[in-house]
Amino acid sequence: MGIKLAHAMGAHVVAFTTTESKRNAARALGADDVVVSRNDDEMAAHVKSFDFILNTVAAPHNLDAFTTLLKRDGTMTLVGAPATPHPSPEVFNLIFRRRSIAGSMIGGIPETQEMLDFCAEHGIVADIELIRGDEINEAWERMVKGDVKYRFVIDSATLAG
């Protein structure tokens, strides 16, 4: 949703992915550019180029790889909450370039309503995979394996009443 929202707001959107196979999907969502974060050359091409990075990864990872991409006074905001902590970032990289790491949760009711209104106005919808109630265990296993493209939504009509 972040890619779709930023694109609709007119931002130049650069998406990061760990695999080449997701490049086309990110472009289809509205990304102007896609960087494979495991490709050192692609990452190096963006050093000191971003004012803001929205980091949605919910697994521990090296934050330094992304904070080095921030311009002076840039901010990376974390919205993914990993089960175990991220490795500690390199402090001098933050201090000397006045870079910041921030966190954010979902907004309150007014912010959520504003976002929903914006989505309705711009025809933005969530990409989901609809599953039946009897597929919940399979969906869980797929999630554990990382074999998930979009959020699962359970079709409530398939649940035993």
Residues covered by each model-derived region:
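Glycine-centered, small-residue-biased loops immediately flanking beta-strands
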Residues: G74-T75, R99
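Hydrophobic residues within alpha-helices
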Residues: G2-L5
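Adenosine-nucleotide cofactor-binding segment
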Residues: H7-A65
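C-terminal hydrophobic helical "lid"/dimerization subdomain
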Residues: A8, I109-G161
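Helix-to-beta-strand junctions that scaffold the AdoMet/dcAdoMet cofactor pocket
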Residues: L70-R72
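Rossmann-fold NAD(P)-binding glycine/threonine-rich loop
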Residues: G80-R98, I109-D117
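Short glycine-rich anion-binding loops that position phosphate/pyrophosphate groups of nucleotides
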Residues: A59-P60, P82-T84, L159
